[in-house]
Amino acid sequence: MSMQDPIADMLTRIRNGQAANKVAVTMPSSKLKVAIANVLKEEGYIEDFKIEGDTKPELEITLKYFQGKAVVESIQRVSRPSLRIYKRKDELPQVMAGLGIAVVSTSKGVMTDRAARQAGLGGEIICYVA
């Protein structure tokens, strides 16, 4: 069976991995998944990530914990294949009054809502992380 929404699968693996106190989670890799993992690492939500394998690359994400608790409290998919959500720069949402982030896919790449607002860009809202 083919995967209908690989990004939702990635977010679910991260959520389930942290709920089970796993050190790392692995998944099939793609350019978009690597870009999302890079944003999560820059914002401090995950420890690290690496890509392994040549013919079928796997993305391994090392999860982050603080005093035994998961750093990611909630992670949810917003725009999905059946319902894409696009926002202009002045419509970009603030997650938890600025305490969380919205991951946005723009014409200049994948970035946080703050970075997109600063660059004056809108785009597709991929997910919310808090």
From Swiss-Prot:
<dbReference type="GO" id="GO:1990904">
    <property type="term" value="C:ribonucleoprotein complex"/>
</dbReference>
<dbReference type="GO" id="GO:0006412">
    <property type="term" value="P:translation"/>
</dbReference>
<dbReference type="Pfam" id="PF00410">
    <property type="entry name" value="Ribosomal_S8"/>
</dbReference>
<keyword id="KW-0687">Ribonucleoprotein</keyword>
<dbReference type="InterPro" id="IPR047863">
    <property type="entry name" value="Ribosomal_uS8_CS"/>
</dbReference>
<dbReference type="InterPro" id="IPR035987">
    <property type="entry name" value="Ribosomal_uS8_sf"/>
</dbReference>
<comment type="subunit">
    <text>Part of the 30S ribosomal subunit. Contacts proteins S5 and S12.</text>
</comment>
<comment type="function">
    <text>One of the primary rRNA binding proteins, it binds directly to 16S rRNA central domain where it helps coordinate assembly of the platform of the 30S subunit.</text>
</comment>
<protein>
    <recommendedName>
        <fullName>Small ribosomal subunit protein uS8</fullName>
    </recommendedName>
</protein>
<keyword id="KW-0689">Ribosomal protein</keyword>
<keyword id="KW-0699">rRNA-binding</keyword>
<keyword id="KW-0694">RNA-binding</keyword>
<dbReference type="GO" id="GO:0005840">
    <property type="term" value="C:ribosome"/>
</dbReference>
<dbReference type="GO" id="GO:0019843">
    <property type="term" value="F:rRNA binding"/>
</dbReference>
<dbReference type="InterPro" id="IPR000630">
    <property type="entry name" value="Ribosomal_uS8"/>
</dbReference>
<comment type="similarity">
    <text>Belongs to the universal ribosomal protein uS8 family.</text>
</comment>
<dbReference type="GO" id="GO:0003735">
    <property type="term" value="F:structural constituent of ribosome"/>
</dbReference>
